[in-house]
């Protein structure tokens, strides 16, 4: 079975690239979707496409609307969602994406360091799995992709 996986969460490290490379090396039947990870491009896209704003609220609102269009469309296409919480920034978007995944019945895998366990306990409780590394996630993807041959005894 092939899985389409939405990669949500922090955009300040290369975790998506690491995960995709590890999955490719393991020859897993997965493809990945995700947000625009260029922070400035993500923030400014609404004003660039729909017109400049002098009020920062409306500048951000236009960008958020276009990013929500992308996120919701891709979440709908995904078979499962992986959300990574980093240690450096408060990640409201990551928490929101995790909530959307759960609300739309998408299986959720969460990645974060042990230091965030208490802060993320409710999100962790809603997840199917909580990992600390991309390697653990690749092992999970390998397990759920495993094919059994019941024709031989």
Q: Where are these predicted regions, by residue range?
A:
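Conserved catalytic or regulatory cores that recognize and/or transform ribose-phosphate-containing ligands
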Residues: 1-153
């Amino acid at each position: 079975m092939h899985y389409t996986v939405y990669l949500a969460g922090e955009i300040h490290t290369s975790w998506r690239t690491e995960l995709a490379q590890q999955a490719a090396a393991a020859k897993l039947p997965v493809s990945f979707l995700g947000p625009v990870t260029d922070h400035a491009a993500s923030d400014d896209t609404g004003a660039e496409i729909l017109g400049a704003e002098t009020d920062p609220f409306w500048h951000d609102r236009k960008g958020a609307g276009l990013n929500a269009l992308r996120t919701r469309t891709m979440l709908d296409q995904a078979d499962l969602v992986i959300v990574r919480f980093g240690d450096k920034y408060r990640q409201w978007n990551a928490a929101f994406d995790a909530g959307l995944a759960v609300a739309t019945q998408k299986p959720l895998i969460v990645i974060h360091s042990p230091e965030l366990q208490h802060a993320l306990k409710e999100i962790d409780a809603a997840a199917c799995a909580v990992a600390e590394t991309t390697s653990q996630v690749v092992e999970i993807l390998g397990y759920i992709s495993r094919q059994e041959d019941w024709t031989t005894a």
